[in-house]
C-alpha cells in the first residue's frame, strides 16, 4: 500500500526572539552553503525548481483556499512559470567563485553570498511569488527569510 505523504506544517514565528533564533540558525546554514561548489549549488537549484514544479497544483489549491483569492488553474500556471522560468533562465549562470576575469586589468569578480535576504510575499500570489523569490535567491547562493 502506498504511504501517504506527511503534510508539512509551516513553523509560525510570532515573537522577536523566535525570529532572531530562526535567523541565527539560517546564518549557520549559510556558512555551510557558502562552502558549496558550483555543481552542488546547481544540484540544489534543480532539485528546488523540480520540487516546486511538482507541487504546483497542491500549492495553487492551498493558496486559493487560504486567501480566498484567485482561480486554482491560473495559480497552477503561475507556479509552473515561476519554477521553470527561473530555473531555465539561470541554470547555466556561474554563481560560485570567480564569475568574471579581466586579465588585462587584473580584475576578478568573485561571487559570494551576501547573507540572508528578506522578502515580502503578497496574499494575491503567495505561492508563485515564494517560488520565484526562493529560486532566484537560491540560484544566486543566498538564503531567503
Regions found by a protein language model. Name each.
Residues 93-145:
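Conserved small-residue-rich beta-alpha loop and adjacent elements
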Residues 1-108:
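N-terminal Rossmann-like NAD(P)+-binding subdomain of aldehyde/semialdehyde dehydrogenases
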Amino acid at each position: 500500500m502506498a504511504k501517504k505523504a506527511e503534510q508539512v506544517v509551516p513553523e509560525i514565528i510570532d515573537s522577536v526572539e523566535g525570529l532572531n533564533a530562526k535567523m541565527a540558525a539560517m546564518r549557520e546554514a549559510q556558512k555551510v552553503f557558502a562552502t558549496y561548489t558550483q555543481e552542488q549549488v546547481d544540484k540544489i537549484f534543480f532539485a528546488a525548481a523540480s520540487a516546486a514544479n511538482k507541487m504546483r497544483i497542491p500549492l495553487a489549491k492551498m493558496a486559493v483556499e487560504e486567501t480566498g483569492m484567485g482561480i486554482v488553474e491560473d495559480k497552477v500556471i503561475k507556479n509552473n512559470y515561476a519554477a521553470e522560468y527561473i530555473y531555465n533562465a539561470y541554470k547555466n549562470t556561474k554563481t560560485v567563485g570567480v564569475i568574471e576575469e579581466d586579465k588585462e586589468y587584473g580584475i576578478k569578480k568573485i561571487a559570494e553570498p551576501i547573507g540572508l535576504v528578506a522578502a515580502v510575499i503578497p496574499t494575491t500570489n503567495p505561492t508563485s511569488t515564494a517560488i520565484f523569490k526562493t529560486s532566484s535567491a537560491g540560484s544566486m547562493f543566498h538564503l531567503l527569510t
